């Protein structure tokens, strides 16, 4: 009798977490997820100082391209990492000094990476100072007419 009592108590303890898990799983099945209809974007407060990116006029072209390759891969948000790293892998080797400087200004002159993403995807209008030949190339790259899967960064 005591043995049956102990087995039943231990059995209930072991079954309790499983019942809880199945109850939670069934609750999750009923949950619906929706994406917001519009982008919520607030202006930066005026009291936040944004540091100016230092201009490097004496930097050799190859060194600048290597730096831009690294900076395009390490943006801090996956969306831009994928878009910019694939863009650089495709176009950077063919850029001349002026185009390289434009790309440098684009990715380092903007204080918010979401701005680059919204401009490249045509979610927001591009400001005139950043609406350059390089931005137009980036927008074409983002449209992905070739239907290339961009689920990871290209190899170095």
Swiss-Prot record:
Domain of life: Eukaryota
Subcellular location per the Swiss-Prot or TrEMBL entry: Mitochondrion matrix
Source organism: Drosophila sechellia
UniProt xrefs under Gene3D superfamilies: Flavinator of succinate dehydrogenase
One Pfam family per UniProt: Sdh5
Entry similarity comment: Belongs to the SDHAF2 family.
High-level lineage: Eukaryota, Metazoa, Ecdysozoa, Arthropoda, Hexapoda
Transit peptide: 1-24
Function per UniProt: Plays an essential role in the assembly of succinate dehydrogenase (SDH), an enzyme complex (also referred to as respiratory complex II) that is a component of both the tricarboxylic acid (TCA) cycle and the mitochondrial electron transport chain, and which couples the oxidation of succinate to fumarate with the reduction of ubiquinone (coenzyme Q) to ubiquinol. Required for flavinylation (covalent attachment of FAD) of the flavoprotein subunit of the SDH catalytic dimer.
Keywords: Chaperone, Mitochondrion, Transit peptide
Main location: mitochondrion
GO CC terms: mitochondrial matrix; mitochondrion
Subunit structure: Interacts with the flavoprotein subunit within the SDH catalytic dimer.
Descriptive protein name: Succinate dehydrogenase assembly factor 2-B, mitochondrial
One record GO biological process: mitochondrial respiratory chain complex II assembly
